[in-house]
Amino acid sequence: MDPNSDFDFTNLAGAAKPATAASGVKPAVAERSKFYNPAVAQKLFELGGSRERMAEGGVFFSENDKHSRGGLFSKAVVNKMFFIAAGEVALTVGGKTLDTIGAGEIFGEMSVITGAPRSATASAKTKCAAYSLDAEQFQNAIQKMPEFALMLMNMMFDRLRLVAARLASRSIAPGHGGERGLSIFDEATLLQLEAELDDAARLRYSSMQVIMHEGKPGAYMYVVLEGRVTISIKGSVVETSGVGGTFGEMALFDQARRTATATAETEVALLAINRNTLLALIAEKPAFAMALLRVVAERLRYMNSLLA
């Protein structure tokens, strides 16, 4: 699987590589995430989605399509994610087949979560029956089925751990890690979080103080209220989180050791959220779940770019 593949979280990054066109061999379908449960996905899409049918050769979406409301000389484009009930879908980049999606699988979720342009074209290899969800339908659906949001996050974190392990084995060129246009919690979400979490959840760190250590167990995720935090793997900075940014959430989901070190670049104020509080927020606040999915998806996209 292409390390920059970011539109099908049922696949593991780097689990399989597509054959070249010259080989004449059908690309292998990548290994599926151990966290993916097709029954949970089907229930969510049936609960909140719309039925779709696509003839053989029909296009679900095209590479570089991006969400737009349309205008006088352009048509509206609404990003949707899909669950395939029957049939097969080919994912192609630059005309080359990357993967094949079959019944029981989902695709197209990255653009719905982040609003980013499509990174591939999805076309029906056979006649397909599917369900679709746009961003509004998706947020409404996870309010009724927060377990799907948890499943999706676990799949993303599974991929992030693979990417982090690959980054740890190589040098990151200076200037490649840093602050970027990451989707962060907006002011309204931050105010809501501060209001709902007690004073004990607020922490302050001095400049250059280590907040969490790579390889150590983790009990909290953090939301930056003031200042900046640098995130590093094996001593190389991979990103910088500013106000509204999050870090440390991965260890709360899989309860594994930290994959990175976080250090206060300036004096910082943080919200510390433990596992039970995090799971409750996801279950009770679909807007929070959607915001966290967006943050994690953007991080996965960015970390993948460091491997390119």
Regions found by a protein language model. Give the residues of each.
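Cytosolic regulatory regions built on CNB/CRP/Popeye-like sensor folds
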Residues: M1-A308
